[in-house]
Structure formats: C-alpha cells, structure tokens
Amino acid sequence: MPGLLPDIDPDGLLEFSVVYTDRALNHMSKRFTGVVQDILGTLKEVYHAHTAVLVPGSGTFGMEAVARQFANREKVLIVRNGWFSYRWTQIFDADKGLGGGSVVCKARQQGSGPQAPWAPCPAEEVAATIRAEKPKVVFAPHVETASGIILSDDYIRTLTAAAHEVGALFVLDCVASGAMWVDMQATGVDVLISAPQKGWSGSPCCAMVMLSERARQAIEGTTSSSFSCDLKKWMQIAEGYEKGQHAYHTTMPTDALVRLREVMAETREYGFAKVRDEQIELGAKVRALLESRGFPSAAAYGFKAPGVVVSYTTDPGIQNGKKFMEVGLQTAAGVPLQCDEGPDFKTFRIGLFGLEKWHNVDRTVGHLSKALDQIAAAA
C-alpha cells in the first residue's frame, strides 16, 4: 500500500514505524536509500574521497565527531586563522579529557595599523612545527569565515607532506569553502569536513565528512568518545546504505537530505567547474567593489577567499549589520580572530554562497552596490 502523501514517498510503504509520521520520509525506505547513495557518490566524486560519511547536526557536529574519533588524548596542531578555527580549541577545551595538548599556529597581521591585512602562519613554519612537535592530528581551515582567509592548494600540500612524515592525519575544514572544491588526492588531505548550507546550496542538517584511504584505514584503530557523534558508527551506516542496507543510530534528517540530493544533482548538471569559476568571478568583483568604497580587506593579498569577504570598518552600524538590514540585506557581524588582534579590530562579513548568487554575478554585485549607495546617502 503506497504512502498517504504523494510528495513524501508515493511508491513507498504506509507509515507505521515508531520513528516518523506520514509527513516525513522514512530512513528505511527505498527512496531514502537512493538519496543517501546519490549524496555519498557525489561527495566522493567532487572531493576525490575514498569514503563519505553523513553526521546529523551541522558542520560543527562534524568537527567534533572528527576530534572525538581521531584525537582522543592525542597531541594536535591547529592552524588558527580566526574565530571559526578557534572552534577546534573550544572543542578540546570543553572536555579536558579529550585532547592531549595542542600547538596553535596563528594568523599574523601584515604591517602595522588597525586595518593591516592578515595572512596565515607561513606554510614552511607550520610544516617545521609539525615536524618538531609530531602531533597526531593537524587541523586547518580551508576558508576562515572570521577573516576571509583561504589556504591555497600549495599551502595545504606543504602541510600534508609534513603531517604524513610524522604519521599524522591532516584534517581540512571546508564548511565555508563555497564552490572552491578541494581535491583530496591531489592535496594529500586525509579528512575533509563540509556541510550542505554554503557550497551546496542546501539546508543545514548534517556534516559531510570525507576520508582518504589512509584515514579510512586509520579509523579502524580508533574509538570515539561520543555516542551521537561517533564518526566510525556513522561511517558504517553510510557504507551500509551504499550496499542497499539501512541501520539506525540516531534519527536522520531525511527530508533535508532529499533537498540536498536535489541541489547536488542540479549543480552537477550545471557543472562543478562552472560554479567554481562563477564563485571566483563573484568574489573578485565584490572585493573590488568594497575596496573601491573604502572598506579594506582583512585578508592579505594571495589569501583572499572568493566566498567569504571580510572587510574593515570603523562604523559600528556596518560592523553589526544594522545599516545593511535597514536597506534590506542580511550580512554577518564581524567577530574576533583570537589571533592577538588589537582592541580596535572591527570588521563586517559578506557571504557569497549559493547557486542564485553564482549564476547571477552582476545581479549579486548590483544588490551590494545599491545597498552601499543607500548606506552612504543616509550617513
């Protein structure tokens, strides 16, 4: 007997499980099995991953799942380029028994003055620190949303080479990467973390954790310190779905994952390389616009992310987003870097994520330009 509602699972079973109602897709259904298979296949294709895992929650749930799987009571090294890579430190500090000590390589201001730009700790210096400290895991942000800093493939390769020399795993946070897809095989990344709501134009509902073959082997010798964020358990569930099998650990966000699968298919049809090119073009034009209006970039030359633009301001109404809201735009307030910045550090942040923005570069730039005109006129 088919499901009651035609938009949920028209070819499925009549819902009487103890998990869902008729208004949500059942995780045991054939339709949802196909959804998960499609998502995992796309993730492995785009990131050149050996294994893909879905962890319900958000990108931060994925970060914590990785930390609690691979870094229990182990020394770690953290590349900190702002508040959202400081999050790794917060995860370890929240459970004093989790970490075995951390070494932090912080971003640095390039030049003097409150609005001098920031660059990550030099790659060779980080690599030397890895070789000297011999951490078990190295964590780095591909794009840091507090500073707008992006790490180049060459920078990442320098760090992964050093990490592998000392037997460490290299973990790259790509939640805020947008369409700047990272090739795990080409860069040597062992664990890559993403999420649906930025680069994938989906609804927030989970973390996507990709593993290299090396990390897939390493996880077998580890035990998570979390029940709900048990990465190995979620990996086993993902591998089961790939075989057409379902299992239960905690309730999965089935309907949001359906939407994610749909937008992934839309992006593939349009072209992953094409949206990457659009992301780069949009970022360059928005950065040029802001700098022409007197808002310097917080990220130094060579490290300017195309998907997250963080700019300096001295205006509290721009910093907290109020003036943008008054003209119809939702921006993000500036946040601290936790990189020894001064008390006068003040920024605002603009996100350039999603198919609607990428496919309509000039329209997106026009929205921002008009808003800046209106803010200036009201000053």
Model-derived features: where do they sit?
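Generic N-terminal amphipathic, Lys/Arg-enriched alpha-helix
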Residues: 1-28, 306, 349
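Active-site phosphate-binding strand-loop segment of PLP-dependent enzymes
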Residues: 113-178, 191
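Active-site C-terminal subdomain of aminotransferase-like
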Residues: 197-288, 292, 356
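Conserved active-site segment immediately N-terminal to the catalytic lysine
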Residues: 185-197, 207
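PLP-dependent aminotransferase-like
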Residues: 61, 71-136
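Conserved C-terminal alpha-helix-loop-beta "cap" of PLP-dependent enzymes
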Residues: 291-363
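Conserved N-terminal alpha-helix of the aminotransferase class I/II PLP-enzyme fold
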Residues: 17-62, 69, 86, 91
